[in-house]
Amino acid sequence: MKNILIVTGGSGGHVVPSTSLFEHLKNKFSVKMVSDLRGSKYINTEKFKYELIDVPNLFLKPYLLPINIFKYFLNIFQSIRFLKNNKTNIVISTGGYMTFPFCLAAFILQKKVFLFEPNSVLGRSNRFALKFSTKIICYDENLRNFPIKYNSKKVIVKPILKKEIYNLEKNIINLKKEIKKILIIGGSQGASFFDENITELIIEISKKRNFEVIQQISNINNLSSIKNKYDKSNINYKFIEFTNDSHELYNGIDLAITRGGASTLSELSFLNIPFISIPLPSARDNHQFYNSEFYYK
């Protein structure tokens, strides 16, 4: 049995797809997963075992660059030792700065490196590792920032979703349904924009028809204010926090308002739930915009 290591971390956009991949591989391979501290909060520890790694972001604090460069090289040697000790045959990177030391270590040890890119824009770490990778798995055939000379490495697949999603019934659009249910989720990084602007939009729409709102609150300090506004407008609402178990939110949803994360959009699309995507403006390489454009097409 092949030993596979999935390397992930950072935002939920990197981590959530890696857990879906883990689920699909674990019955045929021996699979391990490593993540950094930031990414670990998006991993359901009851379902997935993982090891914590500490990889510095080289450019986050420029004044620490010399120290971080030393730590980064140290990470490469630690990654080599980790792969040797675990007899790893294949490394799969889901992107993020913390994945590159393991990819480079695998290359040094002549192990296979597979890249997994769920976004419609090739991320920087995967871009750096592309040269010595075996294949890159992606959803979008027109992956942006992708060098043409590596086209032979590209493998296009349908979105890899959590197994729970496949067990849900697909949404049947019912225009005659009296009370619609709207899901508002700002993604793993939250969205203060949603707390303020989308809340006002919901209040305005509520003047014309009744509906139920399930809303992720990005900033707990906004909870009381939003609650008071909804109470005054007689809106039926439920507040939620970000959850790794997104499948629990989709039942009976008629419309979703969301950021442009690849995992969320692929789940909504699969379940035939109409959605309005508002991409995160600060997303690197504007990838959330292109994710949204991919599903718009």
Task: Name the predicted role of every residue range.
Residues 6-9, 28-71, 157:
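Conserved nucleotide-sugar phosphate-binding/catalytic loop shared by glycosyltransferases and other
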Residues 6-19, 192:
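A short, glycine/small-residue-rich beta-strand->loop->alpha-helix junction that serves as a flexible
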Residues 19, 24, 34, 40-46, ...:
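Donor-nucleotide binding loops and adjacent catalytic segments primarily
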Residues 38, 108-169:
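Active-site-proximal region of nucleotide-activated glycan assembly enzymes
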Residues 39-41, 90-109:
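An aromatic- and histidine-rich active-site surface loop
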Residues 61-90, 108:
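An amphipathic, basic-hydrophobic alpha-helix
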Residues 88-89, 251-266, 273-274:
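Acidic donor-binding loop of glycosyltransferase active sites
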Residues 258, 274-285:
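Short hydrophobic beta-strand element within catalytic cores of glycosyltransferases
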